Swiss-Prot record:
Oligomeric form and interacting partners: Part of the 50S ribosomal subunit. Forms a cluster with proteins L3 and L19. In the 70S ribosome, L14 and L19 interact and together make contacts with the 16S rRNA in bridges B5 and B8.
Pfam family of the protein (one): Ribosomal_L14
Classification via Gene3D superfamilies: Ribosomal protein L14
GO CC entries: cytosolic large ribosomal subunit
Cited InterPro entries: Ribosomal_uL14, Ribosomal_uL14_bac-type, Ribosomal_uL14_CS, Ribosomal_uL14_sf
SUPFAM superfamilies: Ribosomal protein L14
Designated name of the protein: Large ribosomal subunit protein uL14
Sequence intervals crossing the membrane: none
Keywords (A to Z) from UniProt: Ribonucleoprotein, Ribosomal protein, RNA-binding, rRNA-binding
Similarity comment text for this entry: Belongs to the universal ribosomal protein uL14 family.
One of the GO biological process terms: translation
GO MF terms held by the record: large ribosomal subunit rRNA binding; structural constituent of ribosome
Length: 122
């Protein structure tokens, strides 16, 4: 569960290391975001020669949460931390590589590019 002020790791090669959620998109009173939801983030820590700079604002999709996701069969998939992939204005991934596993819940038309780049889909 991601809410405002939550810090997330970045699971791509854009150069950002840590981002902070500044808004959960999708409704005026929406408080929490889960896996597959789009959030607005601010870059808090970035590599010196990366594509993104500290302080820049981007859209991001949540790919891993410590809270996890419940499947229809009752199983629960949790992760050790929260992670996101940065997106451009057209909601396409900025990076060309994805690090770490992603869940099957991302297999929608919007995020097939992320699923195809990921090394493992759970």
């Amino acid at each position: 569960m991601i809410q405002m002020q939550t810090t997330l790791d970045v699971a791509d090669n854009t150069g950002a290391r840590a981002v902070m959620c500044i808004k959960v998109l999708g409704g005026s009173k929406r408080r929490y975001a889960g896996i597959g939801d789009i959030i607005k983030v601010s870059v808090k820590d970035a590599a010196p020669r990366g594509r993104v700079k500290k302080g820049e604002i981007y859209n991001a999709v949540v790919v891993r949460t410590a809270k996890g996701v419940r499947r229809k069969d009752g199983s629960l998939i949790r992760f050790g931390g929260n992670a996101a992939v940065l997106l451009n204005a057209k909601l396409e991934p900025i990076g060309t590589r994805i690090f770490g596993p992603v869940t099957r819940e991302l297999r929608t038309e919007k995020f097939m590019k992320i699923v195809s780049l990921a090394p493992e889909v759970l």
